[in-house]
Amino acid sequence: MSKVRIRFVKLGKIRWTSHRDVARMWERAFRRVELPLAYSAGFSPRPKVSFGLALPTGHESVAEYLDIELVTEAQLDGESGIDVRALPGRLSAALPSGVDATAAEVIAPGTPSLQEDVASCTWRWVAVPKEGADLPWWSTDSWEAELSARVSAVLSASSVVVTRTRKGEELTDDIRAGIVTLELLEPAGLDPSHGMWLQAELTCWPRTLRPSEVLVALDPGLEERHVRRTHQWILRDGARREPLLEAYPSGATDAPHALERAS
């Protein structure tokens, strides 16, 4: 048997589709291209498909991953078995617009699961004031400088305590250790009401930190829009790498049509 790791995007209107529904889309795509998936044993066998970290509904991503197990050998040269290099194009043609395979690679036996292995994610999003929020500093000429100062304050702090709600219960967490990087990118428009693009690398252990929690640290009156996950990172020998490129750095295949189909 062979295991193959696939990178894919989730862009456009399909970002409102749940993680479970996206999983069903993939199962249908695998059937359409007639991939020989391995199945679990038992009364109700299921295809051996393992997804990485769930993407919150409403968020986009250009760095989603899943692993599949095949009952036949997967090859990089296409001379026998499954031609992995051709998989992204075949799968993208069988998937709805907005979900596209962008790379595929055979992974080595014993490779940790995505759920276990991903240590952090990079996110980009727009920060804007919540409707009705009182943010006097945001409407001044120095709003960009003020936001930059708040980002610097978070990065220089030894502790960043925020309150979040989980299942109706308020929880208090120190999230500073989970913020690897945080930076301002550029205004999202000519007017402050359009917001500011931010980018951050946030850890996934002991739990996954979200951009919304970072905004609470900057100002509770801010909210996120246009959230996109741009990278997932694993650690190898003290260095971070992308999950798919770790096994065979030179063998990744790309599907440049992905962004076009989602637009």
Question: Residues of each region from the PLM?
Answer:
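N-terminal, Lys/Arg- and Ser/Thr-rich interaction peptides
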Residues: 1-6
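Short beta-strand-to-loop capping motifs
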Residues: 8, 68-76, 125-131, 200-206
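N-terminal ordered "arm"
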Residues: 11-39
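A short, aromatic/hydrophobic, helix- or strand-capping loop or linear motif
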Residues: 36-44, 102-106, 161-168, 227-230
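Short, charge-patterned binding micro-sites
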Residues: 38-73
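Ordered, amphipathic secondary-structure segments that act as subunit-interaction surfaces
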Residues: 62-124
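Short amphipathic alpha-helices in soluble, non-transmembrane regions
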Residues: 78-95, 137-157, 214-215
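Core RNA-modification/binding signature centered on pseudouridine synthases
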Residues: 145-263
